[in-house]
Regions:
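A short glycine-rich, Lys/Arg-flanked "PGG" loop and its adjoining helix->strand segment in the class I
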Residues: 146-158
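Class I SAM-dependent methyltransferase SAM/SAH-binding core
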Residues: 70-122
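Conserved alpha-helix/loop element of class I SAM-dependent methyltransferases that forms part
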Residues: 50-68
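Core SAM-dependent methyltransferase catalytic element
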Residues: 224-227, 233-250
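A short acidic, Gly/Pro-enriched loop at the edge of an enzyme's catalytic core
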Residues: 121-132
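C-terminal alpha-helical "lid/dimerization" subdomain adjacent to the S-adenosyl-L-methionine
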Residues: 168-220, 224, 230
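A short SAM/SAH-binding and catalytic strip from SAM-dependent methyltransferases
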Residues: 131-145
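Conserved beta-strand signature within the Rossmann-like core of class I S-adenosyl-L-methionine
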Residues: 160-167
Length: 250
């Protein structure tokens, strides 16, 4: 994968090979699912969101401090957030556990950032490496949410910033009812037509519906050690941007 050699410069940590670091069947199935839809993943996201997810990701990039370096975009998928981050930061790296997603990103050539296949629960980076970490629509797919957030905390520099974009639930009841119908009926149908994998677009809305959002997720961020947390709802609560900082060194 182009640019992986740059990891040596930033610090490399070999994940421990113990019983807790081995991926379970559930994680393997999710990886295969994303691999199966990788080729048309970006197109499908644009159709299903009516293009608004591009605006959401632009807002994520704007939350990263200007000139921050280096920056990790975890669960990067095909890397569509990377060019936005490169416009603001130096030393951007994209990481994801799904190789077909990364290959799609590499072939499309959106970014010059190195792409790294990695497990979010055992990140292959040294402690205190990144000035900022972004995650767009990825944390809800982690097998162990708190462990994944703790790993992000570990690889961040003291004072570093975390920015997460994730789906939520609309706050206004009538809109929530329409959105839930759309997610349950329309998304699997369109997703199935575009990718040939209806099951994936049944699974993804279900994870969004069951994931803690708003203040509930913000509390989890504080629980694992982040401070100065905040959350902002987008498009009536369909998505949220979360922020947190690793405490600065005393």
């Amino acid at each position: 994968m182009n640019g992986v050699v740059n990891l040596v410069r930033m610090g490399y940590r070999k994940p421990p090979m113990d019983s807790t670091s081995s991926p379970r069947v559930v994680g393997t199935e999710v990886r295969r699912m994303f691999g199966a839809i990788a080729e048309r993943y970006d197109l499908t996201n644009t159709v299903l969101s009516f293009g608004i997810h591009h605006l959401w990701k632009y807002r994520v990039a704007r939350r990263v401090p200007q000139g921050a370096a280096p920056v990790l975009d975890l669960c990067t998928g095909t890397g569509d957030l990377l060019p936005l981050l490169e416009a603001r930061a130096d030393g951007v790296v994209g990481g994801d556990f799904c190789l077909p997603m990364l290959e799609c990103g590499r072939v499309r050539g959106r970014s010059s950032a190195p792409l790294v296949q990695c497990d979010a629960l055992n990140l292959p980076f040294a402690d205190a490496t990144f000035a900022a970490v972004t995650v767009a629509f990825g944390v809800r797919n982690l097998e162990d949410l708190r462990r994944g957030l703790a790993e992000i905390h570990r690889v961040m520099l003291p004072g570093g910033k975390l920015v997460i974009l994730e789906f939520g639930q609309p706050t206004w009841a009538p809109f929530r009812a329409v959105y839930n119908w759309y997610s349950k009926v329309f998304m699997p149908w369109i997703g199935g037509c575009l990718t040939g994998n209806r099951a994936a677009y049944t699974y993804l809305p279900e994870t969004a519906k069951s994931f803690p959002c708003g203040g509930d997720f913000e509390a989890i961020l504080r629980e694992v050690g982040f401070e100065a947390t905040r959350c902002d709802g987008l498009s009536g609560g369909i998505a949220y941007i979360y922020e947190g900082c690793r405490p600065a060194a005393p």
